[in-house]
Amino acid sequence: MGLERVVVIGLGVSGRSIARFLAQKGVCVLGVDKSLHALQNCPYIQEKYLENEEFPSQVDYVVRSPGVSKEHPWVQAAIASHIPVMTDIQLAFQTEKFTERESLAITGTTGKTTTILFLEYLFKRSGIPAFAMGNVGIPILDGMQNPGVRIVEISSFQLADQEKSYPVLSGGMILNISDNHLDYHGNFSEYFQAKQNLALCMRNPDDLWVGDERFYGHLYLEEVQKYMRLLDKESALKPLYLHDKYNYCCAYLLAKIEFPISETSFIEAVATFNKPPHRMEYLGQKQGIHYINDSKATTVSATETALLGVGNQAIVILGGRNKGCTFSSLLPALRKAAKSVVAMGECAQEIARDLEEFPVTVVKNLSEALLCAEEQAVPGDVIVLSPACASFDQFRSYEERGAMFKHLVGMEEVLL
């Protein structure tokens, strides 16, 4: 591989991981980014290019960071020159290291991270070494060096380029699908196909489990419902949101493909697991008003799911940057669970138009949204931040948005 010249587009966390991996293999790495600062601070690249410069000659293949669109000019230039384009997922799956031991992967529109982290916790609590990686936070090219079962969260961005078969996964799961990232994929069909591409990564096609009958694979709903009934019988368990219960049962089903983990171990893991923040995170109550941080709800379907668990007196804070979806499909859930909506940010007016049949107040930002919600609230009400939008109009991430909400509520200091 020493003579290969490889372009890496985007030098954020994943891009730097890609560049480091390739440099360690003796590859000549050509780095591309819109930021000169990012180029200057990546020590793994031999040639530096701003993205408005011309595509170089003598390139063997291109690796794009997951967030880099297929419409990026350098990606299009590579395609026009018949140069292979891939993401870190395909790069990892090509390595011999990925066939050495058990590897599981999960994708879907909602619930991926909670399911992945619970699966990792379930394994470790059962004495089975495991490591979560991929879209969950640790880039796959870094995480695959760790011992134990590999548990990979894969996004549609990472599967969009999947054309070849890389049969490395001993188990896989597509949790669900609904409109998301249509601004990136262009349409639902492209988004759906990206998710279905997980099938190309299975060692045995029979070990791909799916939560929607439109996908190719084993429909797992009956199995998951069996485990949900098991949890329902456990009166000692703390109350669980329906979607959390569903995610835990999906993880257990996937774990049992390779490992005989007992139902008792599963129940004990559910009882002791702390799910990640910003996912229907109950912050407490002030003057009888309850607060929930669901900043991770960046899609309409995620907010619909959230509304199933907030009773019928919710004031819902929506808004941010739209990901190509319409908000009118929220109306049935809002009518059951909410008394009003506060719309904020870049697409606030669009939300107000889509929900014109429902009480909506338009504000500029999160601070104003919380003040407005508190003015409307009475004891017993629930104020829930469940935006149904990306955060990038006013924040760097959904985590930053959620941390700011917690700070504004007065439940936690925020470090930005």
Curated annotation (Swiss-Prot):
GO molecular function: ATP binding; UDP-N-acetylmuramoylalanine-D-glutamate ligase activity
A GO cellular component annotation in the UniProt record: cytoplasm
Pathway: Cell wall biogenesis; peptidoglycan biosynthesis
InterPro entries: Mur-like_cat_sf (IPR036565), Mur_ligase_C (IPR004101), Mur_ligase_C_dom_sf (IPR036615), Mur_ligase_cen (IPR013221), MurD (IPR005762)
Main location per the UniProt record: cytoplasm
Classification via Pfam families: Mur_ligase_C (PF02875), Mur_ligase_M (PF08245), MurD-like_N (PF21799)
Protein name (record): UDP-N-acetylmuramoylalanine--D-glutamate ligase
Organism: Chlamydia trachomatis serovar L2 (strain ATCC VR-902B / DSM 19102 / 434/Bu)
